[in-house]
Structures are given as structure tokens and as C-alpha cells.
Design a protein with these regions (language model features):
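Glycan-processing catalytic domains of CAZymes
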Residues: 25-289
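Positively charged n-region of N-terminal signal peptides that target proteins for export
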Residues: 1-4
Length: 289
């Protein structure tokens, strides 16, 4: 009996050591983000349908809609690629199709016609509590590796909202980091710079190509604008953040896509190109060589 007990104890100890070693060997999410070589910004309609493993299996970093993605779909993407999956969460505007719209409705400011949504009064404690206590935790509980925040730069057009946005971003940073997870934002090179310590990464849209909502047309950015965008990319890289770049083009624009990828890569960002509604997913990731 003593011999049997001793054998069980030895096996348990070996398994315990092996488990600890495996855990120690597994890189952190921050390390995996730093090593990511490909990126997909996939929040458009239809991006969560079909065979997600096949669609996203080659991407190291994938952003999908945090509300629409069920836990099983998050797991399917993570399992197929072994990569990171972040939940898209708009914290600077209020979208009428969200499940929390009625709760957020009292905090609406002016209407943003381009996207059919309202800027949010982030100075209001009630709005911040809604995001911090209800919306963000619900997303993280689905197994996401972190959050991807949109419209944190709304303070550029609504400067009075700066204190509230800083408080909200700081709170979200604490929320994700307490869980060992990640926080990314996008755009707002000036607005997000004072908040950079709260982020692990940032995405810059419209580096080389963008979309004009008034003309309903894609257009090429001027050389000076591209140079400024590249300067911002390098600035955030120097601060230790992972940087991605998203450009918008119509389908089958092969030459323009090459230009967008080259401009992003030359500045040090992971490139991505899609339509303005982010519905088009490339068969293969865009890579820097």
C-alpha cells in the first residue's frame, strides 16, 4: 500500500512539474502580440459566418465584433490560428443597433451622419459604468484575448470630453490587465498619445487610401498625409506599442493594395486592406517581407 501511495505521489509531482513547466513555457499575450506578423480587421457583416477556422487560420491577430461573436466562434478562431482574437468595442460613439443602446441613449451627443451614430458623453459616470461594468466584461467573458477600442479619439472634435475618455480608457486598461489580456485602440495620434501607457497596440486607418463619404468614393492620400501617418506609426512603435495599419480600397485594386502594404510595412506596421465596411477578408494575410 505504501509503495502504491508513493508511486501515485511521484506521478502527481511529475505531472505538477510538467504542468508548471508547460505554463511557464507558454508565451504571454503581450509577447505573442509583439511577435504577430499578420492582422485582420474583420468587423463587417458576414465576417463571422462560414468556416472561421479556414478564413482566419493564417492570421496572428484578428479583430472581430465583440458583441456579435459568440464564445464558440472566438474559440474556433483562436484554435485554428493559435493567434490572438480581440473584441471590437466602440467607446466614443453610441450605435443604435447595440444591445446596450437603450441604456446608452441618455448619453448621446451630436449625430455623426457618416456612420449613423451619436458621439457619447464619456464625461458622464453612467456611460462609463455601462461600458466598464456591463459591456466590456461581457465581451471578455467570451474568451477574447483583449479589447480593441474605437473612437477614443472623439476628444479631438469634442475636447471637453478628454477627462472622461482618459478615465474610461484607464479603467478598461485595469480591467483587461487584471485578466492578463490586451488593450488596443485606433487613430487619434494626438489624442491617444497621452494615453499610450494604457495600450498594448494601436491601429491607424487611412495611411495610404481612404473613403470619402460625401462622394461615395475611395481615394488616394496625398504624399504629405502618408508621410505624417508613417511618422505617427514610428512614434508609437518607439513607445513600445504594436502598430497595425488599415487602408480602404475597392475590390481588385492590386496595384493600390501593393502600395498600401508597402507604405505600412516601411513604417513598421502590420498591413491590412479591405473595403470601407470591413467585409472583405483576404484569402492570405498581407505580410511584410
Amino acid at each position: 500500500m505504501k509503495s502504491f501511495c508513493f508511486s501515485v505521489l511521484v506521478v502527481a509531482l511529475v505531472l505538477g512539474v510538467s504542468s508548471e513547466a508547460a505554463s511557464a513555457a507558454k508565451p504571454s499575450r503581450a509577447t505573442r502580440l509583439a511577435g504577430a506578423r499578420s492582422f485582420a480587421f474583420a468587423i463587417g457583416d458576414g465576417t463571422l459566418k462560414g468556416n472561421l477556422g479556414r478564413r482566419y487560420g493564417r492570421f496572428d491577430l484578428v479583430v472581430v465584433d465583440g458583441e456579435s461573436a459568440a464564445a464558440r466562434k472566438v474559440a474556433a478562431i483562436r484554435r485554428s490560428s493559435g493567434g490572438l482574437v480581440l473584441a471590437y468595442l466602440d467607446v466614443g460613439t453610441i450605435e443604435s443597433y447595440r444591445g446596450w443602446y437603450n441604456a446608452a441613449k441618455p448619453f448621446r451627443l451630436d449625430y455623426w451622419a457618416d456612420w449613423g451614430e451619436w458621439y457619447a458623453n464619456v464625461n458622464a459616470g453612467g456611460f462609463r459604468s455601462l461600458i466598464l461594468r456591463r459591456v466590456a466584461p461581457a465581451m471578455l467573458s467570451k474568451g477574447f484575448d483583449g479589447l480593441f477600442l474605437d473612437n477614443t479619439d472623439m476628444a479631438e472634435t469634442h475636447p471637453v470630453q478628454k477627462p472622461g475618455m482618459r478615465t474610461l480608457v484607464a479603467g478598461l486598461s485595469r480591467l483587461v490587465r487584471a485578466r492578463g489580456k490586451l488593450l488596443m485602440a485606433q487613430n487619434g495620434a494626438s489624442a491617444n498619445w497621452p494615453l499610450r501607457r494604457f495600450y498594448d497596440g494601436i491601429n491607424f486607418e487611412d495611411v495610404s487610401f481612404s473613403y470619402d463619404f460625401d462622394r461615395h468614393a475611395y481615394f488616394c492620400r496625398l504624399a504629405g498625409a502618408v508621410a505624417r501617418a508613417q511618422k505617427n506609426i514610428r512614434r508609437y512603435l518607439s513607445a513600445g506599442l504594436k502598430v497595425t495599419a488599415t487602408d480602404y480600397l475597392a475590390a481588385r485594386k492590386t496595384k493600390e493594395t501593393r502600395i498600401a502594404v508597402r507604405n505600412a510595412c516601411s513604417a513598421g506596421a502590420l498591413p491590412y486592406v479591405s473595403d470601407i465596411n470591413l467585409r472583405r477578408i483576404p484569402a492570405r494575410p498581407f505580410l511584410c517581407h
